[in-house]
């Protein structure tokens, strides 16, 4: 190669485009203006060295050794943990990351370079390298072409095999339909063909390594199957692409039926279900059936159900369940009845806006709504098994009904003489023994008169005892409404009329206190006309009897009216058998335990009977009447006190006598469970509402916690209703605990934990409770009159409200002129036109009746002297602090802020 080699000539020799060669020369640090310039041998060697360095190769063997000495390679290994999904679970896999990095020593730091090659050696070396590069490119192109050809052939072969599999599946389906039709046709037993000798040969062995099926549908020739090499290739492809689910290999043989099963056919025809059960079941030997085929489920270790009426079939339509739901049900139990996960039911409740946990109880309405939301049907469950048993007992007690005494309830306003009238009838002094002279619980008595036995219920007249009066009207036969002739109709009088009408019982009006000078019975009749109570003399049907409980005037006439009304009603009841009735009042007596005052309405109550009373039960240990005697039994319309119950029953609960203690205990426990669940559901439902309400109210609302203990259940109920009703948006009365009986140690601990006030109504605290009260500084208060309880709780609640700041205007001054002062700035010359202006009070500046400034007085002078106040009709000078825009005609309003105690 001559020294006059141009760039164009060199490009032809190395088979490289001229432009590319110019770029490479430029990258090697040699600048040429055109392809006709001459390239020297030194420049060629420099280009070759650049290209070798670019491709990571040494220029010569000596250079290679030198390059190796200039390089250092560092290997780094790093262990990591990667979490991958494996079905429903997650698996942690250890991964090792290897990094390799090579560092090359700079050329400036190296030694001298090797001797340059001769031009002939350089040319031969370049040609050899170019030839090797062309050979490698050619081999790579051939390899890619061969790979494309093999891939195309595999795709084509796969399509042909899939088409052949579809054809075979269609033929098998038709054969299965024909076999199912033949099997469904009735045939005599005598005509059943025997299995032929060739039948076993047609069946496939049960071994997994057996050959493919021998039995093939008509029309499927052996030529349609692929060749053995294609099978091998197909198996390799299936192994590589098994995630696609195109083919399934069983014991080294392609299983088309398995492929079809994994394709996910959910809705199957009758023929498909018959064919599938035949494939999975054992051979039956019936000619024409496809049961001779191999079952592919042996690998899972369990045998499948045989075809027939008892075989399992996948449901093809949504299953709608009928779920029985009681009054309450837990989320877990509801999910079990719906055959769902508990989390799914909780999610459905969240979507409906109900925040519940899987163990929480929900009411029937909520459970029914979520059941309908999930696509099922909810029905109300009948949980009254024990209640039905009680009804059966009550029906067994039915016998011949005989006349019974009337039950008369005395109702009316407070201090109208109800108890005094009853005292005169009974010839006792009950009213004198009442605290404050007012009745605070229902009293039950029966009186033997010349006209027969009459049972009386004395109800409280105070507004707090509304529920007591309603309970008395519910169990009564006749209501005697006592109205004071000198006082007329009062609020509780109207309420008693409403209770009597709601209960549907006749009303007799006793106009009391007619012996007083201001008595006006006609006024009472006219006022009751507004309540639709019309006297007989006005054309109505209500008897008005004028009586005097003090003198006894008209009492006999009243008893005659009661007896007449009872005869009209024809009151009857069964006097024998198991007793039933209603609890009028209950209490907890020291030494006697729970005591319940009951009114027998059916049957006869005897000592030793097993009693169920609400959620309480027990055996009757003793019976007491209102005089303290112990009768042997109590018949209909007779009130008695019962001892022996397991706890204090609620006033108004019904009681019934049962045969044995076991039934009584079961019924009481079931009622208690239902009541507790209902209470939990109510508290859980209101919990979030209370939280949101507290968030909305913030810190503005005060809370007064109370612990209430009383002598009887009715008083507890009345106190709770009256005190909770005092709550408003500023203060909330919260009764954290209430009960019947004395104040115990647990009551004191509850009050100490919640910083509550203990209210004892006709009860006292024991020694241990008093010790806790003293050590913790608990507020303990005793009461015997309900008026005092309400008044004192109002005072305590008002003290929690704090004080209210009010502004009161004390004086107004009219600005007549404005003066300038070097010390105070603008000084207003004013005339006090109203009240008094004081220096220490805040002021407002009004302009055209609009407040333009609010601040305080800086200076108040009269005749250049500082004064504390200026009264009406006096001139003065007023300096307003930090305000210099006072103008003539403005008004300066002086006011003071006062604190006013807030009340309920």
Curated annotation (Swiss-Prot):
<dbReference type="InterPro" id="IPR005225">
    <property type="entry name" value="Small_GTP-bd"/>
</dbReference>
<comment type="similarity">
    <text>Belongs to the TRAFAC class translation factor GTPase superfamily. Classic translation factor GTPase family. IF-2 subfamily.</text>
</comment>
<keyword id="KW-0547">Nucleotide-binding</keyword>
<feature type="region of interest" description="G5">
    <location>
        <begin position="548"/>
        <end position="550"/>
    </location>
</feature>
<dbReference type="Pfam" id="PF22042">
    <property type="entry name" value="EF-G_D2"/>
</dbReference>
<feature type="region of interest" description="Disordered">
    <location>
        <begin position="267"/>
        <end position="316"/>
    </location>
</feature>
<feature type="compositionally biased region" description="Low complexity">
    <location>
        <begin position="178"/>
        <end position="230"/>
    </location>
</feature>
<feature type="region of interest" description="G1">
    <location>
        <begin position="412"/>
        <end position="419"/>
    </location>
</feature>
<dbReference type="InterPro" id="IPR000178">
    <property type="entry name" value="TF_IF2_bacterial-like"/>
</dbReference>
<dbReference type="InterPro" id="IPR009061">
    <property type="entry name" value="DNA-bd_dom_put_sf"/>
</dbReference>
<dbReference type="Pfam" id="PF00009">
    <property type="entry name" value="GTP_EFTU"/>
</dbReference>
<feature type="region of interest" description="G4">
    <location>
        <begin position="512"/>
        <end position="515"/>
    </location>
</feature>
<keyword id="KW-0963">Cytoplasm</keyword>
<keyword id="KW-0648">Protein biosynthesis</keyword>
<dbReference type="InterPro" id="IPR023115">
    <property type="entry name" value="TIF_IF2_dom3"/>
</dbReference>
<feature type="region of interest" description="G2">
    <location>
        <begin position="437"/>
        <end position="441"/>
    </location>
</feature>
<keyword id="KW-0342">GTP-binding</keyword>
<dbReference type="GO" id="GO:0003743">
    <property type="term" value="F:translation initiation factor activity"/>
</dbReference>
<dbReference type="GO" id="GO:0097216">
    <property type="term" value="F:guanosine tetraphosphate binding"/>
</dbReference>
<protein>
    <recommendedName>
        <fullName>Translation initiation factor IF-2</fullName>
    </recommendedName>
</protein>
<dbReference type="GO" id="GO:0005525">
    <property type="term" value="F:GTP binding"/>
</dbReference>
<feature type="region of interest" description="Disordered">
    <location>
        <begin position="134"/>
        <end position="252"/>
    </location>
</feature>
<dbReference type="InterPro" id="IPR013575">
    <property type="entry name" value="IF2_assoc_dom_bac"/>
</dbReference>
<feature type="binding site">
    <location>
        <begin position="458"/>
        <end position="462"/>
    </location>
    <ligand>
        <name>GTP</name>
    </ligand>
</feature>
<dbReference type="Pfam" id="PF11987">
    <property type="entry name" value="IF-2"/>
</dbReference>
<dbReference type="InterPro" id="IPR053905">
    <property type="entry name" value="EF-G-like_DII"/>
</dbReference>
<dbReference type="InterPro" id="IPR004161">
    <property type="entry name" value="EFTu-like_2"/>
</dbReference>
<dbReference type="GO" id="GO:0005829">
    <property type="term" value="C:cytosol"/>
</dbReference>
<feature type="compositionally biased region" description="Basic and acidic residues">
    <location>
        <begin position="134"/>
        <end position="177"/>
    </location>
</feature>
<dbReference type="InterPro" id="IPR006847">
    <property type="entry name" value="IF2_N"/>
</dbReference>
<dbReference type="Pfam" id="PF08364">
    <property type="entry name" value="IF2_assoc"/>
</dbReference>
<feature type="binding site">
    <location>
        <begin position="412"/>
        <end position="419"/>
    </location>
    <ligand>
        <name>GTP</name>
    </ligand>
</feature>
<comment type="function">
    <text>One of the essential components for the initiation of protein synthesis. Protects formylmethionyl-tRNA from spontaneous hydrolysis and promotes its binding to the 30S ribosomal subunits. Also involved in the hydrolysis of GTP during the formation of the 70S ribosomal complex.</text>
</comment>
<dbReference type="Pfam" id="PF04760">
    <property type="entry name" value="IF2_N"/>
</dbReference>
<feature type="binding site">
    <location>
        <begin position="512"/>
        <end position="515"/>
    </location>
    <ligand>
        <name>GTP</name>
    </ligand>
</feature>
<dbReference type="InterPro" id="IPR044145">
    <property type="entry name" value="IF2_II"/>
</dbReference>
<keyword id="KW-0396">Initiation factor</keyword>
<dbReference type="InterPro" id="IPR015760">
    <property type="entry name" value="TIF_IF2"/>
</dbReference>
<dbReference type="InterPro" id="IPR036925">
    <property type="entry name" value="TIF_IF2_dom3_sf"/>
</dbReference>
<feature type="region of interest" description="G3">
    <location>
        <begin position="458"/>
        <end position="461"/>
    </location>
</feature>
<feature type="domain" description="tr-type G">
    <location>
        <begin position="403"/>
        <end position="572"/>
    </location>
</feature>
<feature type="region of interest" description="Disordered">
    <location>
        <begin position="102"/>
        <end position="122"/>
    </location>
</feature>
């Amino acid at each position: 190669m001559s020294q006059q080699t141009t760039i164009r000539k060199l490009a032809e020799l190395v088979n490289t485009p001229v432009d590319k060669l110019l770029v490479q020369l430029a990258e090697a640090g040699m600048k040429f203006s055109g392809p006709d310039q001459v390239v020297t041998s030194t420049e060629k060697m420099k280009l070759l060295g650049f290209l070798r360095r670019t491709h990571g190769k040494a220029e010569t063997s000596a250079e290679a050794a030198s390059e190796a000495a200039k390089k250092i390679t560092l290997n780094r290994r790093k262990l990591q943990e990667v979490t991958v999904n494996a079905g429903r679970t997650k698996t942690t896999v250890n991964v090792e990351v290897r990094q390799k990095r090579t560092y090359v020593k700079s050329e400036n730091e190296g030694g001298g370079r090797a001797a340059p090659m001769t031009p002939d050696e350089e040319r031969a070396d370049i040609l050899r390298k170019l030839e090797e590069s062309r050979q490698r490119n050619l081999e790579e192109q051939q390899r890619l072409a061969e790979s494309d050809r093999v891939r195309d052939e595999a795709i084509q072969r796969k399509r042909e095999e899939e088409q052949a599999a579809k054809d075979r599946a269609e033929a098998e389906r038709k054969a299965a339909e024909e076999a199912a039709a033949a099997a469904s046709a009735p045939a005599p037993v005598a005509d059943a063909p025997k299995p032929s000798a060739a039948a076993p040969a047609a069946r496939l062995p049960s071994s997994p390594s057996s050959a493919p099926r021998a039995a093939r549908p008509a029309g499927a020739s052996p030529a349609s199957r692929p060749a053995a090499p294609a099978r091998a290739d197909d198996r390799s492809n299936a192994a590589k692409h098994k995630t696609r689910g195109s083919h399934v290999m069983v014991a080294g043989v392609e299983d088309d039926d398995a492929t079809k099963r994994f394709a996910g056919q959910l809705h199957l025809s009758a023929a498909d279900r018959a064919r599938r059960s035949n494939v999975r079941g054992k051979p039956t030997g019936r000619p024409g059936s496809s049961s001779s085929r191999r079952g592919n489920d042996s690998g899972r270790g369990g045998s499948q159900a045989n075809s027939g009426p008892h075989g399992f079939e996948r449901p093809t339509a949504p299953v709608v369940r009928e779920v029985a739901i009681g009054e309450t049900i837990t989320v877990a139990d509801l999910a079990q009845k719906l055959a769902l996960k508990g989390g799914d039911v909780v999610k459905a409740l969240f979507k409906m806006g109900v925040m519940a946990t899987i163990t929480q109880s929900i009411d029937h309405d909520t459970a029914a709504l979520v059941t309908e939301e999930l696509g099922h049907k909810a029905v109300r469950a009948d949980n009254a098994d024990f209640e039905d048993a009680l009804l059966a007992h009550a029906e067994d007690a039915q016998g011949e009904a005989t006349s019974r005494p009337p039950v008369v309830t005395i109702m009316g306003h407070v201090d109208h003489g109800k108890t005094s009238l009853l005292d005169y009838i009974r010839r006792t002094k009950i009213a004198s023994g009442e605290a404050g002279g007012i009745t605070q619980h229902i009293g039950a008595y029966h009186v033997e008169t010349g006209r027969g036995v009459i049972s009386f219920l004395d109800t409280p007249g105070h507004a707090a005892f509304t529920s007591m009066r309603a309970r008395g009207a519910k169990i009564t036969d006749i209501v005697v409404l006592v109205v004071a002739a000198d006082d007329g109709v009062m609020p509780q009088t109207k309420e008693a009329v409403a209770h009597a009408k709601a209960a549907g019982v006749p009303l007799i009006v006793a106009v009391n206190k007619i012996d007083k000078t201001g008595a006006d019975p006609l006024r009472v009749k006219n006022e009751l006309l507004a309540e639709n109570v019309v006297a007989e003399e006005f054309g109505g049907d209500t008897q008005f009897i004028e009586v005097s409980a003090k003198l006894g005037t008209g009492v006999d006439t009243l008893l005659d009216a009661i007896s007449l009304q009872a005869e009209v009603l024809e009151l009857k009841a069964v006097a024998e058998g198991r007793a039933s009735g209603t609890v009028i009042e209950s209490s907890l007596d020291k030494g006697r335990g729970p005591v319940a005052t009951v009114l027998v309405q059916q049957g006869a109550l005897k000592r030793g009977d097993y009693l169920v009373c609400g959620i309480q039960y027990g055996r009757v240990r003793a019976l007491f009447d209102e005089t303290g005697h112990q009768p042997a039994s109590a018949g209909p319309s007779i009130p008695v006190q019962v001892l022996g119950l397991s706890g204090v029953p609620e006033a108004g609960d019904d009681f019934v006598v049962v045969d044995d203690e076991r039934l009584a205990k079961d019924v009481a426990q079931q009622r208690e469970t239902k009541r507790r669940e209902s209470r939990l559901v109510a508290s859980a439902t209101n919990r979030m509402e209370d939280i949101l309400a507290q968030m909305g109210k913030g810190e503005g609302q005060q809370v007064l916690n109370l612990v209430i203990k009383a002598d009887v259940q009715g008083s507890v109920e009345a106190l709770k209703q009256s005190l909770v009703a005092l709550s408003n948006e500023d203060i909330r009365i919260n009764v954290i605990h209430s009960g019947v009986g004395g104040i115990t140690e647990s009551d004191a601990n509850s009050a100490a934990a919640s910083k509550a006030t203990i209210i004892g109504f006709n009860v006292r605290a024991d020694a241990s409770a008093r010790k806790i009260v003293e050590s913790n500084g608990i507020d303990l208060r005793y009461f015997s009159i309900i008026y005092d309880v309400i008044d004192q709780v109002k005072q305590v609640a008002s003290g929690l409200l704090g004080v209210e700041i009010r502004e009161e205007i004390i004086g107004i001054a009219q600005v007549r002129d404005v003066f300038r002062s070097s010390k105070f700035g603008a000084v207003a010359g004013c005339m006090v036109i109203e009240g008094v202006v004081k220096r220490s009070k805040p002021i407002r500046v009004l302009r055209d009746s609009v407040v333009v400034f609010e601040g305080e007085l800086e200076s108040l002078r009269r005749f250049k002297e500082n004064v504390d106040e200026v009264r009406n009709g006096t001139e003065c000078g007023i300096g307003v602090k930090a305000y210099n825009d006072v103008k003539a005609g403005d008004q300066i309003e002086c006011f003071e802020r006062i604190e006013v105690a807030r009340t309920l």
